[in-house]
A protein has these predicted regions:
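N-terminal capping/linker segments that flank leucine-rich repeat
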Residues: 2-93, 110, 131, 152, ...
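Leucine-rich repeat
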Residues: 66, 88-91, 109-112, 129-133, ...
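Conserved hydrophobic beta-strand positions in leucine-rich repeat
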Residues: 70-72, 94-96, 113-117, 136-138, ...
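Canonical leucine-rich repeat
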Residues: 82-83, 104, 125, 146, ...
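Right-handed parallel beta-helix
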Residues: 93-122, 128-130, 135-140
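Leucine-rich solenoid repeat scaffolds
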Residues: 333-352
Length: 352
């Protein structure tokens, strides 16, 4: 029995000693956050069910190693206020999404790699001197600005549904995915992002987009902007391009060898130029003002939606993989389907 009691006492002493080793500055900053009011009644400490703020090792979602916080996972805990995590030297991961936090400072965190504060009410976030940060998710907040100048390894950035007017990530050579949809962007700068593969910038107020030096782009979505003229050329890796709802009058897609899906519906296009895109399998150019459309010799094209235009002529000759065509609500008198050996369905009602 004495041996058992001794072991228990030793364990308690070890835990107490471990808790006491936590960096004093980190402990002070966490305690300051705990005393702030939570989204609902009580404090953030109450929301996290913290009974003893001096025993931080026991706080749920807080990982401490060698006297330093290495991870914070407080998703959907009804937290609120300002969270200062600056100078947490060993902090690698932060997930405080789905709360009501208004500002976060994670500056000077050399080990931080993954940061998620989406679905809060953030008006400010500080990423200064976070050299290891590769993933940032701050979508659905109230941010008007974000500085990424000292985040050299960033690969994935989601800032969608914020209040940006301008966003500049030019020459971010490690960036692979950028989602900035649903903001108020009038100016987006991505030139020189040589490794960018996925760009989602729909539902903004963009009037133009410069893709110079973005040659590895695979997926591009510029839905619901104000771009009237767009030429997409020389993007050899591009596989999906969506540009619907843009008031677009001119669209040219050229020399995109791997392009598979093209969606440019609900614009004001009178002509559509698709050159050097031999691997197209799906085209949706419905609800435009096209008077003629030549998509012949696209041997991989399987589905074509060109309904609700002003087409007089439609040429899909020698599209040997073509299975379905919807060309309803046009004025087609010349429809060319020579060599379309797999064509199974043509929806062509209301052409007159």
């Amino acid at each position: 029995m004495k041996k058992i009691l001794s072991l228990i006492a030793l364990a308690v002493i070890s835990v107490s000693a471990f808790a006491q080793k936590l960096d004093k500055a980190e402990a002070r900053q966490l305690k300051a956050f705990f005393t702030q009011s939570a989204e609902k009644d009580g404090t953030n400490a109450n929301a996290l069910k913290v009974s003893d703020v001096n025993n931080l090792a026991a706080v749920e979602g807080l990982t401490i190693e060698n006297g330093h916080v290495t991870a914070i996972e407080w998703k959907d805990k009804h937290l609120a206020g300002s969270l200062d995590l600056s100078g947490f030297k060993a902090l690698k991961k932060v997930d405080v999404s789905r709360n009501r936090i208004s500002s976060i400072d994670v500056s000077d965190n050399p080990a931080l790699a993954d940061f998620n504060a989406s679905r809060n009410v953030l008006t400010a976030v500080n990423f200064a001197n976070c050299p290891a940060l590769t993933k940032i998710s701050v979508y659905k907040n109230r941010l008007t600005d974000v500085s990424l100048e000292t985040v050299p390894l960033l690969e994935n950035l989601n800032v969608s549904n914020n209040l940006f007017v301008e966003l500049n990530v030019s020459n971010s050579t490690t960036l692979k995915t950028l989602n900035c949809q649903g903001c108020h962007l009038e100016n987006l700068m991505v030139s020189g992002c040589t490794n960018l593969q996925n760009l989602y910038c729909g539902y903004n107020k963009l009037t133009s987009l410069n893709l110079f030096g973005v040659e590895n782009l695979q997926n591009l979505n510029v839905d619901d902007n104000e771009i009237t003229t767009m030429i997409v050329s020389g993007l050899p890796a591009l596989s999906t391009f969506v540009c619907s709802d843009n008031r677009m009058t001119t669209l040219g897609v050229r020399n995109c060898d791997r392009l598979i899906d093209l969606v440019c519906s609900y614009n004001d296009l009178t002509t559509l130029s698709v050159e050097g895109c031999p691997n197209l399998t799906f085209v949706d150019c419905s609800y435009n003002d096209l008077t003629q459309l030549d998509l012949s010799n696209l041997t991989f094209l399987q589905r074509l939606l060109c309904n609700n235009n002003q087409l007089n002529t439609l040429d899909v000759s020698f599209d040997s993989a073509l299975v379905y065509v919807n060309c309803r609500y046009n004025f087609i008198t010349d429809f060319r389907t020579i060599g379309c050996t797999n064509l199974r369905m043509v929806a062509c009602q209301w052409n007159f």
